Amino acid sequence: MLLDDLLTDLGPRFRVPVGAIRAGVRHGRMPLFVSWIVTNRCNLRCVYCGCPDIKTSELSTDQALRLVDEMAELGALSVHLTGGEPLVCKDLDQIVARLRSVGVRYGISTNGTLVPKRLRL
């Protein structure tokens, strides 16, 4: 299960949220709506935002696509892609394509500066 892999790869700070998801799934509940920080990177340096200073690794393309599949299998109806600036995520096109292919709706929170370059999303 990808959630177990993520715990191992990403460390102890994810134990509580992943544990809560696992407990909900075991008791017949499912994550209907998911908010996913796909990256902390950003193309801007706003004085009020600390995202660019957060140094975390992003999921590999394979991990991200497996996570989408797992969210769909668990019954997620909608995924909110956020960040940093999600449009700088190198895998965003593939993530969105997979969300579409498994029938999960999605939304993207963006600062808007890269929308003309990534309009097909």
Predicted regions and their residues:
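Conserved alpha-helical substructure of the radical SAM core
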Residues: 3-119
